[in-house]
């Protein structure tokens, strides 16, 4: 008979499987979990506590997790439970049983119990891991896969709207999606569009004013302004404005010049998450600039001396002390420290991938390989999610630089919905996180995808 082992800081006990099953039968009795409000009490400080078993051994978000042992007390203020170091909500306790809820995105890991006795917590750790089961799916949100808008874009319901080349994408706190449908020139080739409540709407077309070559889109800190880099090209763009802005009070249909630098080739704008400062790249110089107000700007750093035309994408981490610089055409990601108090950057260092080396490989730091990584976003845990454009997939990079596959089949293009590791993308260009889903501008498929990985 197979035994189940659970360890605590003070004890290590071996329980036959029959005892586990008997315990579970006992747990099923409703009366066992009933606690009179008047009998709430902490674990007894002068008695030893035990954490014997937990059940079930696997599950997803919302799974009812039961811990059994001795001297837990009944006051949940003295009890803390974690799954893979993520806090689980403790619902109730009856001194021998704790009832908790598995948190979202816990991943596989040990169950830990903390009991407060006096001023300190006693810690108990399970011998076996709880196996987390993710709920995952990739679906098409809007656009008609494989069908591009040839001339004028078609607005309308999600299932009927036609996109040309969804290029950059962002969501506001209400879940409304704003995206740039790529195009250059003055004759409606590019556009700023909006998707909400099941409908796609075009807000601004390319014109003979300042909005001629939209190449990105990002919100101001309070989400009342959209900043749009205007990419200069010698043939069909006749304005020197390299950053355009549009305001919510005008329903984002107005476009005005924010910064004018001739032939800058700006690809990206980043907004500092604490100060609201606006930063942008100068592709012709391989540099990052800061907007200082009233159309003024200052040069902050050069990513790699003597090198330019990287087609940068910029994004701060959640605390604003690190700027990620995606060198798309050089197949790598840099990071650089930023001091918001002094408005100064450190020295850029290679974070993931290797400069000028394309390919596909998971791994840590410079051991990973990309093929045109593009516009990223952060997930709720602060990981970098990034479309690996010419590898036709989405990658995940932890703050420590560990690179793994997030969704898609590496180096296999196409359009397939379903499980993340079975789904196919075609040159995904940009991502943004909204609620519990990753929104993907699937450029080559002329549509926007929804990736739910709990």
Predicted features, each with a name:
Residues 188-194, 238-245, 286-290, 331-335, ...:
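A short loop-to-beta-strand structural motif that recurs across blades of beta-propeller domains
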Residues 29-140, 176, 251, 344:
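Ser/Thr/Pro-rich low-complexity tracts
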Residues 426-454:
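Blade-level signature of beta-propeller repeat domains, shared across WD40, Kelch, NHL, RCC1
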Residues 116, 182-184, 229-233, 274, ...:
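Short loop/turn segments immediately following the C-termini of beta-strands
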Residues 67, 134-167, 183-184, 199-215, ...:
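Gly/Pro-rich loop segments of beta-rich domains
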Residues 171-174, 219-223, 271-275, 316-320, ...:
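Residue-level detector of Asp-centered blade-edge/turn motifs that repeat once per structural unit
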Residues 244-250, 336-344, 452-454:
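Short loop/turn segments immediately following beta-strands, especially the blade-tip
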Residues 176-179, 225-229, 277-281, 322-325, ...:
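Conserved beta-propeller blade signature
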